[in-house]
From Swiss-Prot:
Gene Ontology annotations of biological process type: cell division
Organism the protein comes from: Archaeoglobus fulgidus (strain ATCC 49558 / DSM 4304 / JCM 9628 / NBRC 100126 / VC-16)
Domain EngB-type G: 2-186
Record keywords, A-Z: Cell cycle, Cell division, GTP-binding, Magnesium, Metal-binding, Nucleotide-binding, Septation
Protein function: Necessary for normal cell division and for the maintenance of normal septation.
Keyword GTP-binding appears in the UniProt entry: yes
Gene: engB
Classification via Pfam families: MMR_HSR1 (PF01926)
This protein's name: Probable GTP-binding protein EngB
Cofactor(s), names only, from the UniProt record: Mg(2+)
Family: Belongs to the TRAFAC class TrmE-Era-EngA-EngB-Septin-like GTPase superfamily. EngB GTPase family.
């Protein structure tokens, strides 16, 4: 059987590595500061590689050139490996997503998270959106606005197969874990489903 891949992508400092660790019950390497990790963290279970990609987007203290290089690397990685990627998990910070997205839209730009969501939907067969840091927001209001900004008509509950409210730091990831596992089982990737303990 050919190797398949599940990728985790998201802006710097959204809790991507923390979510990765919460789902798979082990610690992954993290940069000393957000945005400093340039290499993907990967591990393989059976025929599936699980990859935590570097965080993208502007990071205070780094040049825009550096941020663009990281984003370009992430996009190139996804395009290069698109044939083997069976699912992608985009992690957003639910507590700051709306503010950041609205700021970028006021400047006439497509927010990076929205651009990435659209890109992942174009190149990967299944996208899971992990709305992290839910302990810091009003669930319903924020999730409805997040869904709408990503092109999904509220209420967000209609999109439970896409949007997963999580709090990775507290280990509150059960719905995402369950559905990722079920999705892999539906693809006959039983060996990889063992990754979710």
């Amino acid at each position: 059987m050919k190797v398949k891949e599940v990728i985790f992508a998201g802006r710097s400092n959204v809790g991507k590595s923390t979510l990765f660790s919460a789902l798979f019950k082990f610690e992954v390497r993290k940069g000393k500061k957000p945005g400093t990790t340039i290499r993907p963290n990967s591990f393989q279970v059976g025929s599936v590689i699980f990859t935590d990609l570097p965080g993208f987007g502007y990071v205070s203290g780094y040049s825009r050139n550096f941020s663009e290089r990281v984003k370009d690397f992430v996009v190139e990685y996804i395009e290069t490996n698109a044939r083997r990627i069976v699912a992608s998990v985009e992690v957003i910070d639910a507590s700051s997503f709306l503010e950041i997205a609205e700021r970028w839209e006021k400047r006439g730009y497509i927010p990076v998270e929205i651009e990435m969501f659209e890109f992942l939907n174009d190149v990967t067969p299944r996208v899971f959106l992990a709305a992290n840091k839910m302990d810091k927001v009003d669930d319903i209001t924020n999730l409805n606005k997040i869904a709408e900004m990503l092109g999904m008509q509220p209420p967000w509950e209609k999109w439970r197969h896409v949007i997963y409210p999580v709090c990775a730091k507290k280990g509150e990831v059960s719905a995402l874990k369950r559905d990722l596992k079920q999705y892999l089982l539906s693809l006959n990737l039983r060996d990889a489903a063992k990754a979710f303990r």
